[in-house]
Amino acid sequence: MRLKPLIGVAALLYLVTCSSTLHAQAAPDSNDSATAAQAPATSAPSTPANDEPTPMPRVAPAAYPMQEGFIDSRGVLIYYMTVGRGAPLVIVHGGPGASHDYFLPYLLPLARHNRLVFIDERGSGKSQKLDDPAGYTVENMVEDVEAVRQGLVLGKISLLGHSYGGVLAQAYAFKYQNNLSHLILCSTFPSTTQMNEVFVKMKQKMSPELRAHIDAAEKEGLFGHGKDYEKNRYTNDYMIAAWGEGYFPYLYGNKPDPNYDPIAAGIVPWDLYREMWGSHGEFVIDGNLKSVEYVERLPGIHVPTLIMVGDHDECDPSLSKEMHEKIADSQLVILPNSGHMTFVDQQKIFTTSVIDFLHPNLQKRNAAKAGS
């Protein structure tokens, strides 16, 4: 799908510090917890010309500082990037093997209300690669998230996970629930067995020609074929068939990405991908993620939880409905005309749902203003 004992405080390595700043056009709500001090307004001219209107005072646009660096998680350097102010919202990506990049720029509106902490998981994006792929496990990545929380001294965090990142977020909640204030699970699954059943149904809905083409490639074996540069990954032909024709209808709805390229989607750390997802194709998970069977553990999650899914998501909405039934203090949002990339298809609905969930008092104040 493309897209241990508690450790001590991790050593924070500011190997890279970015001094750039993102600017918003409007200042954050002054009553919100994420509000920062505004720059002083400039004074209007005291004696304007008689034929000119008195200019309105100008307020400097709010600035949202961005910082990036690395946290040493038991010898593995984990990349992070933060933007915004307020209570921390840690965001983990899917793949496995993608990076935080695909969240941008879509999640930036959340920075007006929270300090966003994007993480590249071990082996992914800018984070350190491992010599031994056996170190790519959900359990190790849970410890990496905890290392970032400790290293940045974040205190309690809200945690948002998308796709495989949602699996990681569930696993973090099982072990470190006391460190969570909120949990957000987006387009994800609680059971590999159930997800593999979804893949069977996806294949059944393909045209006979496409299904036969994919089945033949998977039967032959997906690695060691094609041109020399293709031998350690899926061939271009298989990526086009699986990620292009097979997956694309489940990725987007309202706003398909015109730049989506199934071959570019294959730019992943293949040793990680094969270790976790498996080597037998896109429509079966048989790597170490086959151990993900969380359904019976979900009732143990007691933090407020928001579950979001597209109405024709690759991670079928039935999976999110079951998570909602199992987690007592949970809300379920099914985004209309949306596939797996809900925050692309329905950016406004997505970001508004997250903001309302994390800041219910802000929602009440806005409703009061609208009614006054």
Where are the language model's segments positioned?
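Catalytic active-site module of serine/aspartate enzymes centered on a nucleophile-bearing elbow/loop
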Residues: 330-372
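Short beta-strand/loop motif that positions the catalytic acidic residue
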Residues: 301, 307-309
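Flexible "cap/lid" loop of the alpha/beta hydrolase fold
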Residues: 184-228
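Conserved HGGG/HGGXW glycine-rich cap/lid loop of the alpha/beta-hydrolase fold
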Residues: 76-129
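Hydrophobic, aromatic-rich cap/lid helix
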Residues: 265-293
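Active-site loop/oxyanion-hole signature of alpha/beta-hydrolase fold enzymes
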Residues: 121-164, 352
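Conserved hydrolase catalytic core segment
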Residues: 155-198
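Conserved alpha/beta-hydrolase "acid-adjacent" motif
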Residues: 314-319
